[in-house]
Regions:
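C-terminal substrate-recognition/cap domain of FAD-linked oxidoreductases
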Residues: 1-109, 116, 120
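Short proline/glycine- and acidic-rich turn/helix-capping motifs at secondary-structure junctions
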Residues: 17-32, 124-140, 168
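Residue-level signal for pocket-adjacent positions within structured domains
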Residues: 23, 48, 125, 133, ...
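A structural signal for short, well-ordered beta-strand segments
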Residues: 51, 89-93, 128, 134, ...
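Short amphipathic alpha-helical interaction segments
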Residues: 101-105, 109, 130, 140-144
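Alpha-helix-loop-beta-strand connector modules within alpha/beta enzyme cores
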Residues: 111-113, 152
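Alpha-helix capping/hinge segments and adjacent helical runs
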Residues: 118-130, 143, 158-162
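Activity-critical C-terminal alpha-helical subdomain
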Residues: 134-169
Length: 169
């Protein structure tokens, strides 16, 4: 833990917390799960676009630096949070739902982040799933597995009533 804390502080990390105490751990997990509402409070009328990145732990610093630079270059309000011990972090981007340009900028940012994670040997999504926004990367990342995935989906959902179009058309 001390080594992790030193690494965090050596890379401008702050407020490093961990606990062996059950109650304190629950508070830390609650804080992690309340991130959405904390971010939303920064700009109450905004919407939140959440994405994630997952890379080998050895590539984590580079990926986060890439995300930070893109966020800064695009002037986005986008806190980065995560439980980075597994190489996974989340970016929560605030945007104006009335401004179509905002959403397009965010989608481009998200796509650049996915391409960077793949370049670094990571995956297009850590926890958020493929869904609609990362469908295009599934074939790129897992080309030899697509037919197997489709056959499993067809076996479980022969009428295609569970999340139609979310991953496979």
């Amino acid at each position: 833990i001390e080594v992790c804390k030193e690494i965090s502080e050596g890379n401008n990390g702050f407020n490093f917390k961990w606990s062996k105490d059950f109650e304190e751990r629950n508070k830390l997990w609650k804080a992690r799960h309340d991130v959405y509402w904390s971010v939303k409070a920064l700009k109450p009328n905004a919407r939140v676009y959440a994405t994630d990145a997952c890379v080998p732990i050895t590539e984590l610093a580079e990926c986060i630096k890439f995300a930070e630079k893109e966020i800064q270059d695009l002037s986005l309000k986008a806190p980065i949070v995560g439980h980075v011990g597994d190489g996974n972090f989340h970016v929560t981007v605030l945007y104006d739902p009335e401004n179509k340009d905002d959403f397009e900028i965010i989608r481009n940012f998200s796509n650049k982040l996915v391409r960077k994670t793949l370049e670094l040997g990571g995956t297009s999504t850590g926890e958020h799933g493929i869904g609609l926004n990362k469908k295009a990367y599934l074939l790129q990342e897992h080309p030899s597995s697509i037919n197997l995935m489709k056959s499993i989906k067809k076996t479980i959902d022969p009428n295609n009533i569970m999340n139609p179009g979310k991953i496979f058309d």
